[in-house]
Amino acid sequence: MPSAVDYSELGGSLPAIASLNASYSQASLSLPSPYYCPLPPGERKAFSDVRRTFCLFVTFDLLFITLLWIIELNISKSIWNSLENEVVHYNFKSSFFDIFLLAVFRFLCLQLGYAAFRLRHWWVIAITTLVTTAFLIAKVILSDLFSQNAFGYVLPITSFVVAWLETWFLDFKVLTQEAEDERVYLAAVNAACEPAPLICPRPVSDGQFYSPPESLAGSEDDLDEEGLGRRAVTEQEKAFVRQGREAMAVVEQILTQEENWKFEKTNELGDAVYTLEIPFHGKTFILKGLLQCTAELVYQEVILQPEKMVQWNRTVSVCQILQRVDDNTMVSYDVSAGAAGGVVSPRDFVNVRRVERRRDCYISAGMATNHNSKPHHSRYVRGENGPGGFVVLKSSSNPSVCTFIWVLNTDLKGRLPRYLIHQSLAATMFEFMSHLRQRINEVHVSYR
């Protein structure tokens, strides 16, 4: 298969490694990738786990209200006398029987709609919640329940709270999660049906990954044969190298699918944030902006000096290099600053990152890994980064400008609403670009 990149044009400092990298790129992209293998249709769950949990909660609603009602029937009289008074001689002002029927109504409607017919719309639960809320408000205003016993408070309040919990769970968990799973599945199918394009120039470093010294790629088969530079020796080091290459392959795929990027928002400086669904990794955020400086300057500031980034990048509070595996691969430890006005607390990350130089771009790609020197710390929630990175593209017409791309796929863990995470990530990316521009201006002033 012919290569889409002419590596003979690369600078003389990296010819051998560049040629190895070209062969690796062809091989890795011509074979099925684990990130783009769709689930066979026969193996897809017809009933999602989150929907099954919702149906179980609806059943709990009915059983819990029934149990409370039975307890209420046994408080003052025998259960049979109480049943006769509340059912046969039903009175709206004094009977709890209608609250039990309300629970039965919710159970039947929700189980039929979301278990039997597997609806993917909120209209059924909107009806049940509206009916429940209206009935309970009328019941509380017009009835004499509060003069009887504690159950005059317990049953209406419990029924009201459980009904709204069901609404929240369906709207924010079931429907959202199933829609995301469906998008991921369709993206996987589309990726499997289309031939993987060969990647051209690959740029810079990763969203939460601050990168290693200047070097290029090598073939894994040649790890033990290279005679120059640092090389991976142990099995763990070779595993780090493999992870770095996997992340690099995914970032390359993302770069070739720019026409599929979904525009999200922009700022006054023209920076734009896009999103793309990545099979088995979910939503990936992509920041793209133009910088008034050379690509080499960004390469030096963002990729080659990660420890110094904390001096000018306020979105990061800690950045340490835990291990330099080889000339292209390193393991880093990063702590992000809080976001969304403190709602999102600081997270720490352990990432493996791979850096490669190309004729017209620089790339640093990485993903989450584990390292013995940084176990989980009780002070931070340990986040997990999917494949992502920084990319710096040189301009063929004007060497004094460059295009900067940040690919960010991260799971912040914790119990945070997904919409809040997405908003905070986009804001953090714009903030990073602001700090980067300020740093570039400071460097330009110091050079004068």
Swiss-Prot record:
For this chain, one GO molecular function annotation is: protein homodimerization activity
Question: What's the protein name?
Answer: StAR-related lipid transfer protein 3
Record keywords = Endosome, Lipid transport, Lipid-binding, Membrane, Phosphoprotein, Transmembrane, Transmembrane helix, Transport
Task: Tell me which species this is from.
Answer: Danio rerio
Q: Which residues form the START domain?
A: 232-445
* Start and end residues of each MENTAL domain: 47-219
List membrane-spanning regions: 53-73, 96-116, 122-142, 150-170
InterPro entries with a match to the protein in the record: MENTAL (IPR019498), StAR-like (IPR000799), STARD3 (IPR051869), STARD3_MLN64_C (IPR029867), START-like_dom_sf (IPR023393), START_lipid-bd_dom (IPR002913)
- What family is it from? Belongs to the STARD3 family.
GO terms for cellular component:
endoplasmic reticulum-endosome membrane contact site; late endosome membrane; organelle membrane contact site
Q: Does the keyword ATP-binding apply?
A: no
What is this protein's function? Answer: Sterol-binding protein that mediates cholesterol transport from the endoplasmic reticulum to endosomes. The sterol transport mechanism is triggered by phosphorylation of FFAT motif that leads to membrane tethering between the endoplasmic reticulum and late endosomes. Acts as a lipid transfer protein that redirects sterol to the endosome at the expense of the cell membrane and favors membrane formation inside endosomes.
PROSITE patterns annotated for this entry?
MENTAL, START
Predominant cellular place of this UniProt entry's protein: membrane
Q: How does it sit in the membrane?
A: Multi-pass membrane protein
User: Pfam family of this protein, just one?
Assistant: MENTAL
The UniProt PTM text for this protein says: Phosphorylated. Phosphorylation allows the tethering of two membranes that participates in the formation of ER-endosome contacts. Phosphorylation of FFAT motif drives membrane tethering between the endoplasmic reticulum and late endosomes that in turn allows the efficient transport of sterol mediated by the START domain.
Answer whether the UniProt record assigns the keyword Transmembrane to this protein.
yes
